[in-house]
Amino acid sequence: MFRIASTIPILWSFDITSGFRKACGQDVYLFSPYADDEKTHRYNPLDYISSSPAERLGDIDAIGQALYSGENNNDKFWSENAKDFFRGVTLFVLETPGLPHTLGEILRQASGKGKPVKEHLLGKLKEAQDAGHPYSNNCVDALNRVLSNSDNTLAGIIATFNTALLSFQNPKVDLATSASDFDLREVRRRRMSIYFKIEPTKLKDARVLINLFFDQLLNLNTRKLPS
């Protein structure tokens, strides 16, 4: 039986096919981030960021590339700076004790937590420096590159940055991406199926999440052949 990962617009198709796959010995998961009853398996894209400093930046940049492709040359300046900002804020979240490692938290921190974003982030960098546990050079450099822009330019960068992450301000999506109940790296090695359910009315809102899910699924399963 083939492993699958597929999007489904309506639940009855899951009900029909998932039972058959379970009977054939597969583990079956339903990722339904907009479910009204919040019954969903969870998928956290940040769980695939390595803890190794040598690999961490590349993993973050791979997510940033999926979020901010910048296919239009006219938008390249904004998308490249949005990726740089994503790199910096993601490192900030990962390196700050006690913060959830989620895309929702990245959006919250990049929104300033009630302060202008520059004041909030630079203030946190200074606090850590003064306390003797500074953020990594990669984090500080990425944030400084973006936050040193003029106010108008910074506003444009942040607007581009926010566009890709606004769906994660939805509490249901934030919860559904707060941890992982399945491992995309296991799709080629284990007998498993992942159904990604999105209601037709949410397809536009979920576009970024769908793209990121399948981008990670492809990249993580083509790094090496399954054993």
Q: Language-model features: where?
A:
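P-loop NTPase motor domains
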Residues: 1-227
